[in-house]
Each structure stands twice: as structure tokens, then as C-alpha cells.
Amino acid sequence: MNNLSPLEVAIADFQAAKTTPELIRATKNLCDLRTIEAIPILIEGLGFNNPAVASVATSGLIELGSQAVPSLLVSLDEKNYGSRAWVVRALASIRDPRSLDLLEHALATDIAPSVRRSAARGLAELNLIYPEDRSKLERCLLALLAAIKDDEWVVRYAVIFGIELHLRRYNPNNKNHCILALKQLSSDSESIKVIRLRAKLALQRLASS
């Protein structure tokens, strides 16, 4: 292997790894190279049904930032929940506007609560500029508003965070609709106490800002 490049060595180690510790070590070595050429292998690691390996690979992809987005966008495996969850988490953390379509779709339709929660966080924090990106910001907010009745409280919690963030940072046309949504989530019609409290906190912060 003396004639191999560091990337080739790291890929060979990754492909030869048999145990979780070996896979983690090989994945970390790939991440440490900080090269876009490692992206396909890191994405492969997201689908191993091994959370420890996927977590390391996701961190490496996030560190590569927008360079990883095109490959992540085309790698979504609708049949592999684990891989899908990590891909959406990575895209949400990178915050690249090119992820908007995928995050919208994931929040609205994905069967996995963790995927919907990550999508909500991603829509809250995409790197968009107001007012230049007003139309995209409105899409993000509309997607969040549509998810306020999500069956899973962890998703509703992320939605509250997103709505509050949008109202504090921008001046959306449907601000009153957002306030009404938060009031609904803070009322007794919401069965989960932590959701009521989080919505009340959002309203208090918005009132004082």
C-alpha cells in the first residue's frame, strides 16, 4: 500500500473493516482528510445500520459543508430509514438553500418522526437572506405552519422553534397566522405540557423583542 494516496489507504481500510471499532476508526480517518473525494464513501457509511459509524460520517459530511450537498441530495434512500434520517440531519445542519425542496418534502411526508424533526430544524435555519430570499423564506414558514398538528410532539417542538426563529429574524406576511398557531399550541387544546410551555415561551420572547 506504499504507493497509495492517503485517500486510497483510508478507503481500503474502510472497505476492509469488519467490526464497529474498525469502521469508526476508518470513518474518522476519511473525515480527517477533509476532501470531497471522500464524500461517496462517507455517504455509504450512513446506510450501514450502525449509528456509531453513521454519526461519525455525518459529522464529516457536515464539516465539508455545501460541497457535500449535491451528493447528499441524490443519495436519499426512501427504503432505508436509518440512512434517510442521517442524510436529512446532515442537510439540516449544513443549511444550504439547495436542500429546501427535500426538507419540505421530508417534513410533510416522511413516516419517521426523527426525520420530520430534523427537517423542521433545517427549514428553520436555512442560510437565506431577507428580503432577497423572501419567497423561499415564506416556503419554509408555510411548511412549518403545516406541521403544527404533527402527531409527534418532538416534531411540534421543532416546529415551534422554527416559527419563533422566523418571526424574530424576518418580517413574514403571515405573522398573525404564526402567532395564532403558537397560541393554539400554548392552549389547553395541546395535550403535551412541554409543548404548551415551549409555545408560551416563544410568545413571551416575541412579545418582548
Curated annotation (Swiss-Prot):
Gene from which this protein is expressed: rpcF
Stated role: An enzyme involved in the biosynthesis of bilin. Might be involved in the specific attachment of phycoerythrobilin (PEB) to the R-phycocyanin II alpha chain.
RNA-binding is among the record's keywords: no
PANTHER family xrefs: PBS LYASE HEAT DOMAIN PROTEIN REPEAT-CONTAINING PROTEIN, PBS LYASE HEAT-LIKE PROTEIN
Magnesium is among the record's keywords: no
Top-level taxon in the UniProt lineage: Bacteria
Entries under InterPro entries matching the protein: ARM-like, ARM-type_fold, PBS_lyase_HEAT
GO terms assigned for molecular function: lyase activity; oxidoreductase activity
Assigned GO CC terms: phycobilisome
Keywords on record: Antenna complex, Lyase, Phycobilisome
Protein family: Belongs to the CpcE/RpcE/PecE family.
Transmembrane segments: none
Gene3D superfamilies recorded: Leucine-rich Repeat Variant (1.25.10.10)
Name of the protein in its database record: Bilin biosynthesis protein RpcF
